[in-house]
Amino acid sequence: MSKPLLEVSACYRSFQAGEQQLTVLKDINLSIARGEMVAIVGASGSGKSTLMNILGCLDKPSKGSYFIDGQDTSQMDVDELAKLRREHFGFIFQRYHLLGDLNAVGNVEVPAVYAGKDRLERRERAESLLSRLGLGERLDHKPNQLSGGQQQRVSVARALMNGGDVILADEPTGALDSHSGEEMMRLLQELHREGQTIIIVTHDMHVAQHADRIIEIKDGVIISDEPNPASNIAAAPKTEVIPAKTKARARVAAWDRYAEALKMALLAMSTHRLRTFLTMLGIIIGIASVVSVVALGEGSQREILKSISSMGTNTIDIRPGSGFGDRRSARVRTLTASDANALKNLPYVDSVTPSIGSSATVRYGNKAVTATVNGVGPEFFRVRGYELAQGQFWDDDSVNALAQDAVIDENTRKQLFPNSSGAMNSAIGEVIFLGDLPVRIIGVTQPKESAFGNSDALNVWVPYTTVSGRMVGKKYLDGITVRLDESVPSNAAEQGIISLLKMRHGTQDFFTINTDTIRQNIEKTTATMTLLISAIAVISLVVGGIGVMNIMLVSVTERTREIGVRMAVGARQSDILRQFLIEAVLVCLCGGALGVALAYLIGVVFAQAGGSFQMIYSTTSIVAAFACSTLIGVLFGFLPARNAARLDPVDALARE
């Protein structure tokens, strides 16, 4: 005698009902051979559905053993049972249990997706099965576009998809009219004749008469197990062989499962568009806030650094005394032109300018204004980054000759020569008086912003020797400004300058102002403020993540039956986990994309509104935004996805 396909021995199944234990199946002993057509008959509450669930590996006995083709299922985990369902069983449910978002072909393909079949192969097989069952013209119809009988035939095709050994039909005619019910039974008999093992679970003895063996169950006990003399259907040996998966095919199958999960996630999102958008809203606001804040911080920082650069890029100012506010600084007279010449010879110094400042009344004709007269060297304009609008700068010869040549700024030109903007009315060559000293204008600088915006100060620059010898009569300097080579670290250069001057003076009777230190401090301050505001914006992301988790928990509850169907046709726990996790991540990624788009829109509005600087968007912040979206999807989507994956398939299928 050949080994039975299914064998149940001394099977008990108990459930906890409050403080009592309810035993639904008692000492069930049953074997079913390959190719049999068996009907399990019993009234409601008799235990027939529980027995079917055990036979179909949806449930496990509390005690006893169950063998499938010689394999003991008692020690198998949930994924091993899922594999048995994929390879050995096909389910036909009373209520069809089709997935409403998929068409007929899509529903039939589901078991093959989890079995890892090639996409083209499974589609061809699904279409072939549906055509064979008379649904060739309904391939693209969704369940709500099909009649009850047509939906049941789709479920039959789904049961046959993986070519399993056993078809389990739970009340296959229960939801059909009499005509459709008879058609269904003829279809099952036809499948039996082709060698399929059929197990029908029903309360209707008329339906059971179509089987060649009838098992009657009552109060959890088999009371009869007899052949049906009225049946004369001979089963042919089943010859269909499902090809084994290779490693390469397994990799493609894994990708197909991801693609299927992505498709289902998109379908779920499109089905509940408003809810999905509201779920995304927290993510959108959070991502837009973070990206916008970073862009604002970067833009403002660049603007401030640009303003600082207007004072002279990479410069060090040297002043007498110990620091700002030192009352003794006026008595320190050790900074001289020879110090400036010594500094100029340092290898890391680009240019140097001495400086002597004075305030004077500047007169031209009947116009008189108060301006700052700056005695500087010929390299001053390079050090400070000034450019000419008209004329020229003076040179070393002018310095040595105490030349009475002057360069004025745009503000001074406007005050003294309001009509001299054109070349025909240029201020060049005009003579003005600095106090009582006449000087000739040889150049006009272009307008230049100060470190903190436009300056209205009036500036006149003349050789420092002229100021020293012809105006103030002092031999010492008010300060020296050094521009460093761009490739040299400013802190190291600053220490070199201090060491040289200390050696020359014998003491440190001066202090330095390093613009690079100012720049670094501003960068740190801006980064700190950006981090602070971003941290506040991240709260919105967390709130959005909680919203995603909440909606995903609702989605799991709404789609419990779908989860049960997927498990019944062979989905692993990892497949269910992946599907809901991908959906959560997809919601967050879409929210992240919309958030970045909103941030760019904010930038456009900011520019149109006349912002004082431009928002600078960085690739890093955008990549970080998407990484953050993905992380939120994983973190807040994991709990709902895990809950879905841990659902009991029997409970899930029974959920309304």
From Swiss-Prot:
Topology within the bilayer: Multi-pass membrane protein
Annotated binding of ATP, by residue: 42-49
Keyword tags: Antibiotic resistance, ATP-binding, Cell inner membrane, Cell membrane, Membrane, Nucleotide-binding, Translocase, Transmembrane, Transmembrane helix, Transport
Q: Name one GO molecular function term.
A: transmembrane transporter activity
The family classification in the record reads:
Belongs to the ABC transporter superfamily. Macrolide exporter (TC 3.A.1.122) family.
Spell out the subunit comment: Homodimer. Part of the tripartite efflux system MacAB-TolC, which is composed of an inner membrane transporter, MacB, a periplasmic membrane fusion protein, MacA, and an outer membrane component, TolC. The complex forms a large protein conduit and can translocate molecules across both the inner and outer membranes. Interacts with MacA.
Q: What does this protein do?
A: Part of the tripartite efflux system MacAB-TolC. MacB is a non-canonical ABC transporter that contains transmembrane domains (TMD), which form a pore in the inner membrane, and an ATP-binding domain (NBD), which is responsible for energy generation. Confers resistance against macrolides.
Please identify the protein, giving its name as recorded.
Macrolide export ATP-binding/permease protein MacB
Please report the organism this UniProt entry assigns to the protein: Shewanella sp. (strain ANA-3)
Question: What gene is this protein a product of?
Answer: macB
